[in-house]
Each structure stands twice: as structure tokens, then as C-alpha cells.
UniProtKB/Swiss-Prot annotation:
ATP binds at residues 8-9, 13-16, 95, 122. The keyword Transferase applies. Its EC number is 2.7.7.2. It comes from Methanobrevibacter ruminantium (strain ATCC 35063 / DSM 1093 / JCM 13430 / OCM 146 / M1) (Methanobacterium ruminantium). Catalyzes the transfer of the AMP portion of ATP to flavin mononucleotide (FMN) to produce flavin adenine dinucleotide (FAD) coenzyme. Its cofactor is a divalent metal cation. It is an enzyme of class 2 (transferase). Keywords: ATP-binding, FAD, Flavoprotein, FMN, Nucleotide-binding, Nucleotidyltransferase, Transferase. Pathway: Cofactor biosynthesis; FAD biosynthesis; FAD from FMN: step 1/1. This is FAD synthase. Homodimer. The gene is ribL. Belongs to the archaeal FAD synthase family.
Amino acid sequence: MKVMATGAFDILHPGHGLYLEKAKELGGEDAVLAVVIARDSTVKKKKRIPVIDENQRLEMIKYLKPVDEAYIGHDGDMFEIVEEIKPDIIAIGFDQGHDVNKLQEELDKRGIKAKAMRVEAHRIADLDSTCKIIKKIRNSDFEEDYVNCD
């Protein structure tokens, strides 16, 4: 069974790892997890200017334990990549704004045989979102020298 998970994955944090782990579990014991990284242009439109570019985000995601396949998404029609990957399940993160029912309706309308499912909500760390990490960095005092940080 192939499960597809999507996201910006801009500054990796424990919430990303948990989302990917839970997404893969939706497919059962022998599931294959395909992760789609949002393009920089998509991240800019939906969230903010990404800190890390799409190619580096793709490389980081490939190293994560639950990930079997990784792709950069397409500009425009988000269903193009779904048609290419052909997942059995599309895992929607608990903090992603997609309406699962509307997504399922669109999949059905397009003849895509995938089931949209929401991953359960879990917060496991204080810095469990990219925005929280950015805010902490902005509020930090960096007066001391850092070693090996060119």
C-alpha cells in the first residue's frame, strides 16, 4: 500500500517526523511512504518565504527513516503529482488546512482511486512548528561567538 504525505518541511522538527511516521502507519505493515515537498513558489504563496530551498528540503526528507520515496511537487494543479505517484492513501497532517471530505470529492471526480485521511493531532515538543523555531531564533540573543559557523 502506498501512502502519500505532503508539506513544506522547511525547518525540520519533531512534528514533521511524527506526521510522517503516523502517515506511514495508515498504510499498514508493508506501506511505502512517498513524500511530496512543496515547491518554493507554493510555500511563498501559502505560508512565507522558505528558509531552505526546495532541493535541500528534498534531500533532508530523503534521509528520514519513514520515507521511502521523495518528490518535489508541481506548480499549479496539486493533483498532477497524485496522478504520477498513484497513492492508495493521501495523509493530511493535523495542522494542514485541507478539508478531507472536499479533497476526497475532488479525487473521486478526477477518477483518482486514493483515500484522503487525516493524521491524528499530536504535539510532542515545544518547538514543534517552523514558525515557533523562527520566533525563538528572532528572540534569541546571539552576542557570543559561535565556533565553526562560517
